[in-house]
């Protein structure tokens, strides 16, 4: 099969699948808990964040503006919601205008509609 729609879904590398399966089999602890499985899960998540930050910003994992946080989301819609609602609320004192177009992804448009109902 030849799959050409990598905008929506991209097949991951086999090594990524193997690592994920290992984590699901052995790293299922709640990372917010204090028992050993939870502590191990927290350590795994911190290591993953560090690897992603280093891939994005180099060996220090820091950008030009200093340290960065990395938030894992369940997917694009959740990430869009977090970014758009967060930016709108953070910057609302500078103005409540949001510019978008009808060709945006539905997740973006729904955020903008919700913000419009809140006076943006």
Regions found by a protein language model. Name each.
Residues 1-120:
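Pyridoxal 5′-phosphate
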């Amino acid at each position: 099969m030849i799959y050409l729609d990598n905008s929506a879904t991209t097949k991951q590398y086999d090594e990524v699948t193997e690592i994920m399966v290992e984590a699901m089999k052995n790293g299922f602890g709640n990372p917010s808990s204090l028992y050993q499985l939870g502590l191990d899960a927290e350590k795994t998540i911190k290591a993953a964040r560090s690897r992603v930050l280093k891939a994005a910003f180099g060996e220090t994992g820091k950008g030009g503006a200093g340290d960065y946080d990395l938030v894992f989301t369940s997917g694009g819609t959740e990430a869009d919601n977090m970014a758009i609602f967060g930016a709108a609320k953070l910057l609302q004192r500078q103005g409540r205008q949001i510019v978008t177009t009808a060709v945006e992804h539905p997740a973006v448009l729904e955020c903008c509609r919700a913000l419009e109902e809140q006076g943006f």
